[in-house]
């Protein structure tokens, strides 16, 4: 697809995708506050509504805020302070969500690490950010203790998958999974940790939301060595605020089933902060087995879900769903990986045959932009595309290795301009400068390294 010089139209100027957005959403200022403050502002009038669900136990927004404040007080009691980085090695549990907002409240940062990593890998990530506090799941304790050797870790906070279960379920879990860990004197269990916070201040420690990194998440290293990506409060709030344009699909009172892990930007920004700031209930599935996804969908009937393409391909072939009415589904979104046109067609045919109004939603982004930069949701979609840029995001293509923008329709390197662009790579200024560049137009762009083009309607197509 090509455009002659005299007809050249540039995406960064024309922004053809804006025709799909209601004018009331365009150009609205971003919340100038922390992630915790934004969460509270959005829900302070709805405290009795459910915020989280964990194996049948429901946690209201009132309880969520109480637990966040208790966690913040406990962090202060064990010495975590403004500017510190605590490393977390865990799947998603309510405690990890409390820890995220509590760390943000006191001006600290969470370094989120995949619990499947080796001892050496976990050790390297602890050392990289010089953590003095390590938070880990009880089932990863042995490896984490080994990983913490020869680091500056002073305390280890252990979270059990049973900590937020109802009493009968907690008893059943402990009978089936007896804790055989040998805990050293520097280890504190979650309930003892919370008790230690009694009497400590729960006041917020002021930070600059444009500068304070609420998390460090790690790239996979597929295009070089793994890097710690610092994402700020403003980055997370930018993702959440931009998805308010999809309120016709996702709104207060609905359920989002969270099947993504906390150690990727997609899992926390889209799977936790976004739905909670929209007033949804987040049903937490800590270890989502794709083979069991169909039964989970039938059990919880979530209107929304963020996953990867294989999740939906699995659903489309699940015999348990063969004759089921799935009309409760509003937006099941696939990101994190590409999906072929044929596979997309199969999933959409399955959804339509089961009374789902809209096709599978899609998105494109990367860790460096806090997960998402584009979305195809509801009726706004084209086969094979990654959707249109989010309402406050600009996506265009450039001559590879340069800042020369190419016209709409021409293929080049995809670059992204958004308030969700990372603060930078942790202690890697040269790598940051190579990816995060100020162009002649004065805007800051992330160079993705991906090849693609934008069509005349503003839809982004990734790949040749």
Residue ranges and their predicted role:
Residues 237-255, 263-306, 314, 318-319:
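Conserved AMP-binding/adenylation subdomain of ANL enzymes
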Residues 303-307, 316-383, 394:
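Gly/Ser/Thr-rich phosphate-binding loop
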Residues 404, 415-464:
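Conserved ATP-binding/catalytic segment of the ANL
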Residues 60-62, 214-241, 376:
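Conserved AMP-binding A3 loop
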Residues 78, 105-195:
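Structural core segment of the AMP-binding/adenylate-forming
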Residues 65-70, 210, 229-249, 259, ...:
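Conserved structural elements of the adenylate-forming
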Residues 180-218, 225, 248-255:
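Conserved pre-ATP/AMP-binding loop-to-beta segment of ANL
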Residues 48-93, 97-101, 118-123, 127, ...:
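Conserved AMP-binding/adenylate-forming core of the ANL superfamily
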């Amino acid at each position: 697809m090509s455009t002659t010089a005299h007809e050249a139209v540039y995406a960064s100027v024309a922004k053809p995708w804006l025709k799909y957005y209601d004018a009331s959403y365009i150009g609205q200022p971003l919340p100038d506050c922390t992630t915790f403050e934004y969460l509270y502002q959005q829900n302070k009038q709805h405290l009795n509504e459910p915020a989280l669900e964990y194996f049948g136990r429901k946690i209201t927004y009132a309880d969520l805020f109480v637990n966040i404040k208790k966690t913040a007080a406990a962090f202060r009691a064990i010495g975590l302070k403004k500017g510190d980085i605590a490393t977390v090695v865990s799947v998603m549990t309510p405690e990890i969500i409390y820890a995220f907002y509590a760390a943000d409240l006191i001006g600290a940062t969470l370094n989120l690490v995949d619990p499947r990593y080796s001892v050496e890998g976990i050790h390297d990530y602890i050392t990289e950010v010089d953590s003095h506090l390590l938070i880990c799941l009880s089932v990863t304790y042995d490896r984490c203790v080994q990983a913490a050797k020869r680091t500056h870790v002073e305390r280890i906070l252990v979270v059990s998958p049973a900590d937020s279960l109802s009493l009968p379920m907690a008893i059943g879990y402990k009978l089936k999974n007896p804790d055989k860990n040998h805990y050293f004197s520097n280890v504190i269990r979650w309930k003892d940790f919370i008790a230690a916070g009694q009497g400590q201040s729960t006041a917020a420690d002021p930070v600059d939301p444009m500068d304070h990194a609420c998390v460090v998440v790690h790239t996979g290293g597929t295009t070089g060595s793994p890097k710690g990506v610092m994402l700020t409060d403003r980055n997370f709030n930018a993702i959440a605020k931009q998805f308010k344009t999809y309120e016709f699909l996702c709104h207060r009172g609905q359920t989002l089933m969270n099947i993504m892990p906390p150690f990727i930007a997609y899992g926390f920004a889209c799977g936790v902060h976004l739905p909670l700031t929209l007033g949804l209930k987040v049903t937490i599935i800590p270890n989502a087995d794709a083979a069991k996804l169909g039964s989970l969908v039938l059990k919880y009937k979530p209107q929304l879900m963020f996953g990867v393409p294989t999740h939906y391909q699995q659903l489309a072939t699940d015999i348990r769903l063969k004759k089921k009415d799935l009309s409760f589904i509003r937006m099941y979104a696939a990101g994190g990986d590409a999906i072929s046109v044929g596979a997309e067609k199969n999933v959409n045919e399955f959804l339509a045959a089961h009374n789902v109004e809209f096709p599978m939603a899609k998105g494109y982004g990367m860790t460096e932009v806090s997960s998402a930069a584009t979305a195809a949701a509801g009726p706004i979609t084209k086969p094979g595309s990654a959707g249109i840029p989010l309402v406050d995001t600009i996506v265009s293509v450039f001559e590879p290795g340069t800042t020369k923008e190419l016209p709409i329709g021409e293929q080049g390197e995809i670059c992204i301009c958004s308030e969700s662009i990372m603060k930078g790579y942790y202690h890697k200024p040269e790598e940051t400068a190579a990816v995060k560049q100020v162009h002649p137009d004065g805007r800051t762009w992330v160079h993705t390294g991906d090849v693609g083009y934008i069509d005349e309607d503003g839809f982004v197509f990734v790949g040749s």
